[in-house]
C-alpha cells in the first residue's frame, strides 16, 4: 500500500510521525543519494554517511517540505549537495579511490583496464573542477535530472544552470586533456 503512494504523500505522512511511510522513501532514493554524494566526494564511505545524514534531515524537516515549491527528489538532491559540499570543505577531506575486480579472461581484462584508466582520467579531472561545476555535472549527467530540476536543486535559475553546465563541460574537457598529458609524460 505505502509503495504505491507518491513521494510527496509519503513525506506528508512522515511529517505527521508515521515511521512506516519513511521506509519506502529510503528504499526508493537511498541509492541515488549515495551516487550523488559519491560523485561530489569521490569517497564511498563518506557518501554513505552523507546519504544517511540526508535522510535524517528529511525525517527531521519533513514538515517544512512544500510540494508546491519542488518535487521530493529535488529537495533531497539539494540536501545531499549541501551536506556533500560541507563535508568537502572540511580539512582532511580527500577522495578515496575504489578498487574494482578485474575480469579473468585476457581480452575482457584488457578492455576493463582501458575503461578503468579512462574512468580514472575523467574522475581525476572532475575532482579538479570547482565544486559548483562538479555538482552541475553530477546532477545533470550522473543523476539524469532535467535542467530545470538540477537548477532547482542548486538554487539557480534555469538560465544560470545552463550557463554553469556549459562552463563545467568546457572546463572538464580541458581538465581531461591536461590529466591525460600529465599521465603520458
Predicted feature locations:
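Helix-turn-helix DNA-binding module
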Residues: 123-135, 139, 143-160
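Amphipathic, Lys/Arg- and hydrophobic-enriched alpha-helical face
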Residues: 26-44, 61, 77, 126, ...
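Arg/Lys-rich amphipathic alpha helix in sigma70-family domain 2
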Residues: 60-67, 78-97, 115, 176-178
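Short, charged helix-capping/linker segments at alpha-helix termini
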Residues: 1-2, 15-24, 34-53, 158, ...
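Sigma70-family region 2
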Residues: 15-16, 42-43, 55-69, 90-91
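Structural recognition of an alpha-helix C-terminal capping motif at a helix-to-coil junction
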Residues: 49-56, 70-82
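Internal acidic/polar
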Residues: 4-7, 86, 92-119, 146
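C-terminal edge and immediately downstream basic/flexible tail or linker adjoining helix-turn-helix-like DNA-binding
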Residues: 2-3, 115, 124, 152-155, ...
Amino acid at each position: 500500500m505505502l509503495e504505491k503512494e507518491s513521494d510527496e504523500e509519503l513525506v506528508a505522512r512522515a511529517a505527521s510521525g508515521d515511521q512506516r511511510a519513511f521506509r519506502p522513501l529510503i528504499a526508493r532514493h537511498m541509492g541515488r543519494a549515495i551516487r550523488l554524494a559519491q560523485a561530489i566526494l569521490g569517497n564511498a564511505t563518506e557518501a554513505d554517511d552523507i546519504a544517511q545524514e540526508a535522510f535524517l534531515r528529511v525525517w527531521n524537516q519533513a514538515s517544512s517540505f512544500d510540494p508546491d515549491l519542488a518535487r521530493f527528489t529535488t529537495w533531497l538532491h539539494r540536501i545531499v549537495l549541501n551536506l556533500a559540499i560541507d563535508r568537502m570543505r572540511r580539512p582532511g577531506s580527500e577522495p578515496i579511490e575504489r578498487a574494482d575486480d578485474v575480469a579473468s579472461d585476457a581480452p575482457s581484462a584488457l578492455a576493463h583496464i582501458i575503461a578503468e584508466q579512462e574512468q580514472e582520467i575523467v574522475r581525476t579531472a572532475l575532482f579538479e573542477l570547482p565544486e559548483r561545476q562538479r555538482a552541475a555535472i553530477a546532477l545533470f549527467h550522473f543523476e539524469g535530472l532535467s535542467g530545470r530540476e538540477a537548477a532547482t536543486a542548486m538554487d539557480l535559475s534555469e538560465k544560470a544552470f545552463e550557463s554553469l553546465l556549459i562552463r563545467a563541460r568546457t572546463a572538464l574537457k580541458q581538465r581531461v586533456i591536461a590529466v591525460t598529458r600529465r599521465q603520458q609524460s
